[in-house]
């Protein structure tokens, strides 16, 4: 299976991911994975920084957001993002404690969730799957 995963196509030209994460170490890890896969990316340390990016003409094929952001949380950001860009795909990242708080109805269509700590392979698979969907 690992060999098959290596054969999956990398990013198409111009595909861009918005990373919204307040932990610089996680942001660096996610951006390194995206760079390795050939995706462009834009980073924001919190939701208030991300909103103007979402409102701009910046191409965004996927938003990866921590659920537990300072101020406005990732789910609230996704709601605003979808008001501006109705087809915005969102991959939430959450810690174990936060994952327990995620109830039914949290994820709308086009939204998925992975739990920290996550593997390079899981992040890679989710990003590819969601952008291709």
Predicted regions and their residues:
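Disordered, acidic interdomain junction associated with two-component signaling
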Residues: 1-18, 104
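Residue-level signal for the "D+5" position in two-component response regulator receiver
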Residues: 43, 69-72, 83-84
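Conserved acidic carboxylate
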Residues: 21
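Active-site residues of response regulator receiver
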Residues: 66
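Acidic, metal-coordinating helix/loop segments flanking the phosphotransfer/catalytic sites
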Residues: 43-62, 82
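Charged docking surfaces used in two-component/phosphorelay signaling
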Residues: 28-36
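Acidic catalytic/metal-coordinating carboxylates
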Residues: 46-49, 70-77
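Alpha4 helix (beta4-alpha4-beta5 surface) of REC/receiver domains from two-component response regulators
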Residues: 75-76, 80-83, 87-115, 120-129
